[in-house]
Swiss-Prot record:
Species the sequence originates in: Helicobacter pylori (strain ATCC 700392 / 26695) (Campylobacter pylori)
One cellular component (GO) term of this entry: cytosol
Enzyme class: transferase
Major localization listed first in the record, in broad terms: cytoplasm
Cellular location(s): Cytoplasm
EC number: 2.7.4.8
Full protein name: Guanylate kinase
Coiled coil start-end: none
Length: 206
């Protein structure tokens, strides 16, 4: 397995702002790879297959499970979601920072595969703000939104398993915080080859 210190997991309720912050990181840090999730749900307005998600049928997804193509997968709101293995391993080999936008279930599984991954939980200040955002998004029925709020509260119970928490109340401030977290990944001491660094320092070639 390749260096897993370059993994950044963003998780939290739908509507908290994970996608916005992920896009911001991709704009600010050139050497990144966004792990595109595969899902069986229908595309929302404006979503493009291969850009926002890999949209597949339930049959195709189940075939992927049988073939061991996913690092993790889960059923969320009656739809399958999963993280493909090969693109992630390729990006790590190339030394890129790999960014995940996944739910709490996926976070728990990924941390078993990549224990050194850095994880950030992103949330709103309270459930009323989250509800307002979901209503404004206009992609879910009121019944679905209520289910999302119930699920969001369950996810909040898992906060202790994350490294960082961002209350996304001020978007510009949240952008600053997530960027500072991402930048620290390339300087985490455990990610370096100490023997190589020491030899290079002694030979004055570093």
């Amino acid at each position: 397995m390749h260096n897993d210190f370059n993994l950044l997991i963003l998780s939290g309720p739908s509507g908290a702002g994970k996608s916005t912050l992920t896009k911001y990181l991709q704009e600010k840090i050139p050497k990144t790879h966004f792990s595109l999730s595969t899902t069986t749900r229908k595309p929302r307005e404006g979503e493009v297959d291969g850009l926002h998600y890999n949209f597949v049928s339930e049959e195709e997804f189940k075939q992927g499970i049988e073939k061991g193509q996913f690092l993790e997968w889960a059923i969320v709101h009656n739809h399958y979601y999963g993280t493909s293995k090969i693109p992630v391993e390729k990006a790590l080999k190339e030394g890129k920072i790999v960014i995940f936008d996944i739910d709490v279930q996926g976070h728990e599984i990924l941390k078993k595969h990549y224990p050194n991954a850095c994880s950030v939980f992103i949330s709103t200040k309270n459930q009323e703000i989250l509800k307002e955002r979901l209503l404004l998004r206009g992609t879910d029925s009121k019944e679905t939104i209520e289910k999302r709020l119930i699920n969001a509260y369950k996810e909040m119970q898992c906060l202790e398993s994350f490294d960082y928490l961002i209350i996304n109340e001020d978007l510009e401030k949240s952008k600053e915080i997530i960027l500072s977290i991402a930048k620290t990944l390339v300087h985490r001491l455990k990610a370096f080859n100490f023997e190589k660094i020491c030899k290079a320092w002694k030979n004055e070639t570093l």
